[in-house]
Regions:
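N-terminal leader segment of winged-helix/HTH proteins
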Residues: 1-33
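Charged, amphipathic alpha-helical coiled-coil/dimerization segments
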Residues: 74-133
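C-terminal regulatory/oligomerization modules of transcriptional regulators
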Residues: 1-4, 125-152
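Short, locally clustered residues in the helix-turn-helix/winged-helix DNA-binding domain
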Residues: 44-48, 109, 136
Length: 152
């Protein structure tokens, strides 16, 4: 590898450490409410997704079906969610908050979203859009390169 590439890679890893820090902060936030990080992001997904299903959560969060099922069962047993059969697909159930669950989720998620809002406001929407565009491009190219190696 050439020296210039190594410098860029070092800069990239500094950015990657920033993403890891974001996840670590989010995990600490979740723990302050007695939740695992995974249960927190699933709760967040239910809160922000209309007619949410386990399939949607698995797809959006890239989580295994079993992991999502365990979290859904946890929230169900706590009385925070109810599962309603989808009339269009009887094998699928949509996830809805109970009154208690809605209060529980609002207490956790709305505070977190307020922090997100304040952060985005400081950084600026244009910078956020650029960041997302670059991150998605990088991920797509990287996935293609890794797939080439895997499929050899």
């Amino acid at each position: 590898m050439d020296e210039e590439f190594e410098q860029y890679l070092a800069k990239f890893y500094k950015g990657y450490k920033g993403m890891q820090l974001f996840n670590s902060i989010s995990e600490s936030y979740a723990k302050s409410f007695g939740l695992s990080y995974v249960n927190f992001i699933i709760l967040y997904s239910i809160f922000t997704t209309e007619n949410c299903t386990q399939t949607i959560i698995c797809k959006n969060l890239s989580l295994p079906k079993q992991t999502v099922n365990i979290a859904i069962t946890y929230f169900y047993k706590k009385g925070y969610i109810k599962l309603i059969e989808n009339p269009e697909n009887r094998r699928e159930k949509t996830i809805h908050f109970t009154e208690e669950g809605k209060k529980y989720a609002e207490n956790i998620i709305l505070k977190f979203q307020e922090c997100e809002y304040k952060t985005i406001k400081v950084i600026g929407l244009e910078n956020i859009e650029t960041f997302i565009k670059i991150l998605n491009s990088y991920a797509e190219i990287w996935q293609n390169e890794i797939t080439k190696i895997i499929n050899k």
